[in-house]
Regions:
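Local cysteine-cluster metal-coordination motifs and their immediate loop/turn environment
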Residues: 32-58, 65-82
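Nucleotide/phosphate-binding catalytic cleft detector across ATP-hydrolyzing
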Residues: 64-69, 74-217, 222, 234, ...
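Glycine-rich phosphate-binding loop of actin/hexokinase-like ATP-binding domains
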Residues: 218-222, 227-253, 317-333, 365, ...
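N-terminal phosphate-binding loop and adjacent alpha-helix
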Residues: 246-287, 413, 424-429, 515-518, ...
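Short glycine-rich phosphate-binding loop at a beta-alpha junction
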Residues: 293-304, 459, 538-548
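Short glycine/threonine-rich loop-to-helix capping motif typified by GTGT followed
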Residues: 304-318, 536-539, 548-567, 609-618, ...
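Catalytic phosphate/nucleotide-handling subdomain of diverse soluble enzymes
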Residues: 394-396, 536-600
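A contiguous, well-structured pocket-lining segment that forms one wall/lid of small-molecule binding clefts
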Residues: 463-533
Length: 642
């Protein structure tokens, strides 16, 4: 159910889901409300007046009885339950004009948008469960047990090839299981990789277990491991869970982990940690649904090249040494139990292929999900992160590259940077006269630090307000106690110590700004260099797809303002969220789409940006906000001029 919210003065109107938080709504709509406790309810500054309609909100000590009866509420403590008109008390500037509202950026992935990108898929998984009642052997029919099983599987299918089998454990257990089950069994079949290949018997269970048929899609991230359980009979998502990758204790980025893997016992420790994390995700999911891990029939996974190597116990040593070569690009089918994963003993682990050392299976999975290999639309596919990955192309060709953006987007190298967890500042607006902030945190909790989306938001707002210049330097002439000379040079105080969890001021420093500009500069230089390598520019693009959880939370206008994304028609941008996980879900459910994985991989040509002589020039040009060439950012130039 949706409701309309109109903010006055300014008459900014948005449509929102019933129950959404009013402070979050205002921040997403570009409406400034004075608030600096992150939405924790302790500063009392986000006072608004409900002129029409109603919100659900309790009176707090920050509101007098008279104010409450007059319709005043704290935005951070109010949920929209009907159409409302909200008056913001401090919306008048010193010149008497109402504050100009920012363009609203819609980030939600609607079902229609998702279908336009990824299409539809069937519920016809690559693994099949089939219940069989076999005739017991007799003197007249005393064929081998495996022959009897294969014959029953092929019965009624004239064109089918007799299924194969691939592991001795199956033969060892087969005669005892068949007889104990009175010849009534459920066979688990893996469809042939190609239409002409026979199916493969990978498991056998006593009785009829076809109702318990589950698959697990997994994104093995450097920071987080995410899993989705799917009922393979219906295609329905049953549960989701995620956990921090326990490898973090050995290093926060892939380079640190590759280095650690070279220590005695390091590779084994890293593999055990990622398997431990995956097992925790499986355990959480199974508890939610009320099933056993043994009910999971197969696992489809993707991750960057380092994570995929470590998961199956392959040494990633040569990924970081020129000429940056992985051990393999297409990983062999692996029995999950053999590497310690808790699932059915017959479960196979499928991994998406990785084109290069720093362009992994997670990107192939994302490209596969949004069907670049089937679309005539020329697409720029971006996964923003420490190791920014880029793909350009369509159904005829695909080129891919990675650019080392550094950890700024994930909180690394930022004085008060952190991952996007509770208390992280994720949205920010600034008053153009007083330079006082509007701060919204993840979970509307007391501020703890700044996550990647918050960093982009803060820098974009400071730039537009004139608090920093295009070199990323603070305007030292401004009359504001929040801009000061700190221990690491000039800085802006986002949250005072008394309002933060840390008990110290949360600040953004000029060093932080430098690190952000290097990160966004590397990404932008990557787009331009890769486009140039195929003789194209941003004008040739039909669409830009932002993948990854981070991409789903950044504000489009603010990302363009700092030069992280190109200044092109906003209608060409699409948000896909965790595309890697989505690709795994599709392959898990539809065997036709499953078979396309390798086609996508083979279509992708990798380019090494570090070897391109033009990359460094584009990188240096992008070390400005938004860029040294403002003609590339006409909308930002107009905002900064006006």
């Amino acid at each position: 159910m949706t409701n309309k919210v109109r903010f006055v003065p300014g008459n900014t109107e948005v449509e929102v889901q019933t129950g959404e938080n009013l402070l979050n709504i205002a921040a997403s709509a570009g409406v400034y409300i004075h608030a600096f406790c992150g939405g924790d309810g302790v500063c009392g500054k986000c006072k608004v007046q409900i002129e029409q309609g109603a919100v659900v909100s309790d009176r707090t000590m920050k509101l007098s009885r008279a104010d409450f009866e007059a319709g005043y509420r704290l935005a951070c403590r109010s949920r929209v339950e009907a159409d409302v008109v909200v008056r913001i008390p401090d919306q008048i500037r010193r010149d008497g004009k109402a504050l100009k509202q920012k363009p609203k950026t819609t980030r939600a992935i609607t079902a229609r948008t998702l279908e336009a990108l990824v299409g539809t898929w069937d519920v016809s998984p690559p693994v099949e469960k089939r219940y069989l009642e076999l005739p017991p052997p007799t003197i007249d029919d005393n064929v081998a047990d495996m022959r009897r099983l294969s014959r029953a599987i092929s019965a009624g299918c004239h064109d089918c090839k007799e299924p194969t089998y691939d592991h001795p454990e199956l033969l060892r257990d087969l005669p005892f299981l068949l007889r104990k089950a009175d010849w009534k069994v459920t066979v688990i079949l893996l469809r042939g990789k190609r239409v002409e290949e026979p199916d493969r018997i990978i498991g056998l269970e006593p009785g009829n277990t076809t109702s318990k048929f589950y698959g697990l899609a997994v994104d093995i991230g450097t920071t987080t491991v995410c899993g989705v359980l799917i009922d393979l009979n219906s295609g329905k998502i049953m549960a989701e869970a995620s956990a921090y990758n326990a490898q973090i204790g050995y290093g926060e980025d892939v380079i640190s982990r590759i280095v650690y893997a070279q220590r005695p016992g390091g590779l084994k420790a890293l593999q055990e940690k990622v398997v431990y994390t995956l097992n925790n995700v499986i355990e959480t999911i199974c508890k939610k649904v009320g099933i056993n891990a043994a009910d999971i029939t197969y696992i489809m996974s993707a991750g960057n090249t380092t994570m995929e190597h470590l998961l199956v116990g392959l040494d990633p040593k040569f990924l970081r040494e020129a000429p940056y070569v992985p051990i393999c690009s297409q990983f062999p089918l692996t029995r999950a139990a053999a590497i310690g994963i808790q699932a059915h003993p017959s479960v196979r682990l499928f991994l998406y292929p990785s084109p290069a050392s720093y362009v992994g299976g997670d990107i192939v999975s994302g490209v596969h999900a949004c069907q670049l290999h089937k679309s005539a639309a020329l697409t720029l596919f971006i996964d923003i992160g420490t190791n920014g990955e880029i793909v350009i192309g369509n159904q005829e060709w695909l080129v891919c590259a990675a650019c080392s953006a550094g950890p700024a987007f994930e909180g690394g190298g930022i004085k008060h940077g952190m991952r996007a967890s509770t208390g992280a500042i994720e949205k920010f607006h600034i008053h153009p006269d007083t330079y006082e902030p509007m701060v919204v945190t993840v979970g509307l909790a007391k501020p703890r630090g700044i996550c990647g989306s918050g960093l982009i938001s803060i820098v974009a707002e400071l730039l537009e307000a004139g608090a920093i210049d295009q070199r990323g330097k603070f305007n030292r002439q401004l009359d504001s106690p929040r801009i000061r000379d700190g221990a690491d040079g000039y800085e802006y105080v986002i949250v005072w110590a008394k309002d933060s969890v840390l008990g110290e001021d949360i600040v953004l420093t000029e060093v932080d700004l430098d690190n952000l500009m290097r990160a966004k500069g590397a990404m932008y230089a990557g787009y331009v260099t890769l486009l140039e390598s195929v003789g194209m520019t941003f004008a040739d693009l039909d669409r830009v797809v932002l993948a990854g959880n981070f991409g789903a939370y950044i504000d489009l206008e603010q990302a363009i303002s700092i030069g992280l994304l190109p200044d092109i028609d906003r209608g060409r941008f699409f948000y896909l969220g965790n595309a890697s996980l989505l690709g795994c879900q599709i392959s898990l459910t539809d065997h036709h789409r499953f078979r396309e994985r390798v086609e996508v991989f083979k279509l992708m040509t990798h380019m090494e940006l570090s070897e391109n002589p033009h990359f460094m020039g584009h990188y240096m040009a992008a070390l400005f906000l938004p860029h040294t060439d403002m003609s590339l950012f006409p909308s930002v130039r107009a905002k900064l001029a006006g």
